[in-house]
Amino acid sequence: MSNLQLDQNGQLRHFLSIQGLNRELLTRILDTAESFSTIGAQHVKKVPLLRGKTIVNLFFENSTRTLSTFELAAKRLSADVMNLNVRTSSTQKGESLLDTLRSLEAMHCDMFVVRHSDSGAAYFIARHVPSHVSVINAGDGCHSHPSQAMLDMLTIRRHKGSFPNLRVAIVGDILHSRVARSEIHALATLGTGEIRVIAPRTLLPRNVESLGVHIFHDMRAGLKGVDVVITLRLQRERMEGARLPSEREYFQLYGLTEEKLALARPEAIVMHPGPINRGIEIESAVADGPHSVILEQVSHGIAIRMAVMAMTMQIPVPEAKEAR
């Protein structure tokens, strides 16, 4: 399934999942993002790399950060951008995903950025587009969110340098989190020293040990000596049945507080993919505190999404300069 992402020369054609991408390719994405990272501070916040290309954002789930940063990334690359409003589209009249796709293809689009509640939706679209069209997965069900993982890897690399000596803890709703799956694969591929997952048994997927992680049900034990803490949103909308007694009890056991964070290394950083539920996954004193790099993650999302857009379009990326 991962081979669909690469062309015959091993270059990115689609960006659907971290799985199947090697360390060299992930590092190239990070390095390419670095070349775009200063564009937002320039007087002219554009480079002409995708001028004349048309990118369609197909978001079948709600989004703030992901949609806005993909749109901004495309515009900073000088692409033409169309956001499909699913609530007012013909999908509300029963039109199938494939028929929607074919209609958009007839408009000669060059890339689809897709978010969908069904796992595998981005792969389905990638299998049905013409060879010149690229697909980027902006989140599919509980399966994958590769660009979020890569913006988090960029954030970690900027603060911590290399990965092999790091201890990283991922805390919370691992079971329903596409972010967690992508983070684990990215951290493992980049050679992270130790990956910990901290969660109640009811919020862990089966056979999670096979991903090479260390499991902790006691948050305090799991946070001891870690360099990076990634907290996850509690995804009530994806839960079936009673997975938790109450949000209050969840916060007592798995909410990140200053007291619990003190068990990590003194220079530890705190991350969250958003949206944040304050008082459930994390307290405000931590989310807004000196260890938090949550807003940096959002900023890095633009550079990462510029990088994967340029790379999947197979556009050579020179040193970033202002558009003329």
UniProtKB/Swiss-Prot annotation:
Residue positions binding carbamoyl phosphate: 65-66, 115, 145, 148, 274-275
Signal peptide: none
GO cellular component, one term: cytosol
Biological process, per Gene Ontology: 'de novo' pyrimidine nucleobase biosynthetic process; 'de novo' UMP biosynthetic process; amino acid metabolic process
Assigned EC number: 2.1.3.2
Summary of subunit composition and partner proteins: Heterododecamer (2C3:3R2) of six catalytic PyrB chains organized as two trimers (C3), and six regulatory PyrI chains organized as three dimers (R2).
Family statement: Belongs to the aspartate/ornithine carbamoyltransferase superfamily. ATCase family.
PANTHER family the record matches: ASPARTATE CARBAMOYLTRANSFERASE, ORNITHINE CARBAMOYLTRANSFERASE, MITOCHONDRIAL
Name the UniProt record assigns to this protein: Aspartate carbamoyltransferase catalytic subunit
Native source species: Nitrosococcus oceani (strain ATCC 19707 / BCRC 17464 / JCM 30415 / NCIMB 11848 / C-107)
